[in-house]
């Protein structure tokens, strides 16, 4: 397995996609999938069904993984 150059907490810049130019923090690293989850980028709405804890249900905004080729590490 190749060495991964990103760690949780690193500051990165999105270099491709809808969030191009955004600088944010890495929340999680997924080395097997070759992806990272970046705070506030690639947000999708997930529908939540009503449950006993959440009787209303509704929508949840969630960050989705971004391929590492679309992310560049920024020296702080």
UniProtKB/Swiss-Prot annotation:
One of two assembly initiator proteins, it binds directly to the 5'-end of the 23S rRNA, where it nucleates assembly of the 50S subunit. One of the proteins that surrounds the polypeptide exit tunnel on the outside of the subunit. The gene is rplX. Keywords: Ribonucleoprotein, Ribosomal protein, RNA-binding, rRNA-binding. GO terms for cellular component: ribonucleoprotein complex; ribosome. The keyword Ribosomal protein applies. The keyword Ribonucleoprotein applies. CDD domains: KOW_RPL26 (cd06089). Belongs to the universal ribosomal protein uL24 family. Part of the 50S ribosomal subunit. One of its GO terms (biological process) is translation. The lineage of its organism: Bacteria, Pseudomonadati, Campylobacterota, Epsilonproteobacteria, Campylobacterales. Pfam families: KOW, ribosomal_L24. GO terms for molecular function: rRNA binding; structural constituent of ribosome. This is Large ribosomal subunit protein uL24.
